[in-house]
Amino acid sequence: MDESFDAFEIKPNSSIIEHFNNHPTCIDKEFNFILQKTELRALETDKFRSALEAKNKLKNRYSNVLPFEETRVKINIDDDDDDEDDNEDDIIVSNNNNNNNNNEKRIKRNSIGSSGQSDVMSNSSDEEDHGGSGDEGTTLSDYINASFINNGTYICTQGPLLNTIVDFWKMIWEQNSNIIVMLTREEENFKTKCDKYWPDKDEERYGNFIVKFDNNITIPDILIRREFTLENLKDNKTRKIYHFQYTTWPDHGTPVSTTGFLKFVSFVDHEKRSGPIVVHCSAGIGRSGTFVAIHSIVAKFAKHYDEKKQAPSINLPKLVVEMRNERPGMVQTRDQYRFCYLAISEAMNTVLKKEQKKRKGLSYSYSSIPLTGPEHD
């Protein structure tokens, strides 16, 4: 480990509150350290070779939010990926109702996407749509704007574009992922942040995949939980997909409540996971990075405490730098970085309080057991 990270480590016998009290300027100092460690790497254009290829240009929602070559997710290229109606420029998207009437629409691959490649990435990148009509076509490739994070525990990706929805579901299938975490709304401040890639009822077809709506549950101000059945038409196999959408996270901001956000995290963890957790907001760096940082540290803390009954050390700057070395710009703002600490602190305190209650309850139960049989008059 780089020795310069040691100064930011929170030891097992300390706490985040003590860390804040002992280092009043720690947020600014740590975030500046993160920028210093990662900003040069994000400017090296050779690190983004596939993302910058002309044929992949329209697959990027934002021209300055791109995946590193070495950590990008690759999708398989199949001969019949684009054969669905002998038209290699179109993607089939169909809506099938219960009467088996098939209402198909076709989306031109060259009709939607980024208007151009400007800066590769900057730490002050605005999560605003750079999209345009575009007049350059794309060809089949293994490229999708998505990155493996934390050694493949997560995949962080942009909100799908209309012309990348098929690629998105293909990635879900190939990576054997059954959990999708969505941290944006489809539209925010009158701007499209994510194109809709799922049906609200019945089913829709995306290329060689059918996504069937099963059910949903809405908890106001926290989440919409959806269940889908994903069918691969090429091998006639199906899988269950769990889709969790956090509905109250403002772009570039932070959730109002750490408690509400941690409830959302607990809902995600309730489902047994297969494959990487696929996380996206709009660009796949700010809100997505914040979720991954919180989720990974809270999971580490809970596991370590359950096994050893003591808290592990925490080094948030080290984690964020590692994440940014896998996808540029992860945990995009200082406020998001601060929110990580606040949410992690609350989650840790919750675990400790539960353990204290458990011990008190155990102590009480032992003291309440009579040592002899009941007395009789």
Curated annotation (Swiss-Prot):
Signal peptide: none
Sequence ranges of Polar residues compositional bias: 113-123
The entry's keywords: Hydrolase, Protein phosphatase
Alphabetical list of InterPro entries matching this protein: Prot-tyrosine_phosphatase-like (IPR029021), Protein-Tyr_Phosphatase (IPR050348), PTP_cat (IPR000242), Tyr_Pase_AS (IPR016130), Tyr_Pase_cat (IPR003595), Tyr_Pase_dom (IPR000387)
Reactions performed catalytically: O-phospho-L-tyrosyl-[protein] + H2O = L-tyrosyl-[protein] + phosphate
UniProt domain Tyrosine-protein phosphatase: residue ranges: 27-347
Pfam families noted in UniProt: Y_phosphatase (PF00102)
Listed Low complexity bias regions: 92-102
GO biological process: aggregation involved in sorocarp development
Family, per entry: Belongs to the protein-tyrosine phosphatase family. Non-receptor class subfamily.
Annotated protein name in UniProt: Tyrosine-protein phosphatase 2
